[in-house]
UniProtKB/Swiss-Prot annotation:
NCBIfam families: S18
Assembly and oligomerization: Part of the 30S ribosomal subunit. Forms a tight heterodimer with protein bS6.
Alphabetical keyword list: Ribonucleoprotein, Ribosomal protein, RNA-binding, rRNA-binding
GO cellular component, one term: cytosolic small ribosomal subunit
Source species of the chain: Rhodopirellula baltica (strain DSM 10527 / NCIMB 13988 / SH1)
Family listed: Belongs to the bacterial ribosomal protein bS18 family.
Protein name: Small ribosomal subunit protein bS18
Lineage of producing organism: Bacteria, Pseudomonadati, Planctomycetota, Planctomycetia, Pirellulales
A Pfam match: Ribosomal_S18
Record field: compositional bias (Basic residues): 1-19
Length: 87
């Protein structure tokens, strides 16, 4: 393998694009992180058809916002605003 092909392989490394958090797309995150448990439109997007909370990889949330979403979904379920089981 020549030096040229090694240099070419190194230059092909892709830069990672930062994904925007789907919960706070306007760029302003409230501190402390809080998601309203009465916002059923947002919470229903974070729950799959079976009623399970989607993971971070699938939802695209950061760790802090995923934790806030999980807490809000659990509160909404306790208040009977969201079902525990899906369809």
């Amino acid at each position: 393998m020549s030096t040229r092909s090694r240099a070419r392989k190194r230059s092909r490394v892709r830069s990672r694009t930062r994904r925007k958090d789907p919960i706070f797309v306007d760029g302003h995150r409230p501190r402390p992180m809080y998601v309203d448990y009465k916002d059923l439109e947002l919470l229903s997007k974070m729950v799959n058809r079976q009623g399970r909370i989607m993971g971070r990889r699938k939802s695209g949330c950061t760790a802090a916002s995923q934790h806030a979403v999980t807490a809000a979904i659990k509160r909404a379920r306790f208040m009977a605003l969201l079902p525990y089981v899906g369809e």
